[in-house]
Amino acid sequence: MTSLALTTAVKRIVSAAALAMAVVVTLELAFGYGATTAIPSIVQWTCMIAAYIMGAFWWFGPWPTLGQAFAFVVIANFAIFSATITADFAPEVTLGKCAFLIPIGMLAGFFFDKWRLATHIALCLLGTTIVAVYIVVERGVDTFVAVVLWAPIVISFTGFALLLQATTQSMRLEFE
């Protein structure tokens, strides 16, 4: 993976994305938007701590192997969905927090093969759809509003990742 990037810049960007996720959850907890029952609180705290650890790993750690980077993407996907669905926010904010998937998808689109990228996209589609259904069923949001919120997020994390994948593949073919 190292031959394809300015490793320090990529590490800092991915670290900043992970740390931003952690800071958002920290602020949720500090300002009373955290989960209000025991199990969701544990989930939220676990996701926050995991995001801080992942951010520190990307900032201070060595360049990850492909397996480590893929594990990061999968764990980050689950952490984003778990922290999102357990927070006590307005429904629009709840679904909007899925936008954290965009930088994760860009990492996947640039560095991963099509199967790892497909796994990331499938997890994102599933998780974002679950969040959208949740805000309709549990929070009483109109279905149309949920779709209007859901669609740009899905298009963004899918589109950016696929565009980067296509660009990367064409660049690799040029140099073969």
Regions found by a protein language model. Give the residues of each.
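Short, Lys/Arg-rich, polar N-terminal cytosolic tail immediately upstream
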Residues: 1-7
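Membrane-helix interface segments
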Residues: 65-68, 113-119
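Hydrophobic alpha-helical membrane segments of integral membrane proteins
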Residues: 96-100, 115-123
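Interfacial aromatic-anchored transmembrane helix boundaries in multi-pass membrane proteins
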Residues: 88-90, 128-147
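Central hydrophobic cores of alpha-helical transmembrane segments
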Residues: 71-77, 118-130
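Hydrophobic transmembrane alpha-helices and their membrane-interface boundaries in multi-pass
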Residues: 12-92, 97-105
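Transmembrane alpha-helices and immediately adjacent membrane-cytoplasm interface residues
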Residues: 108-116, 161
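Juxtamembrane or sensor-core-proximal signal-transducing alpha helices
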Residues: 59, 148-176
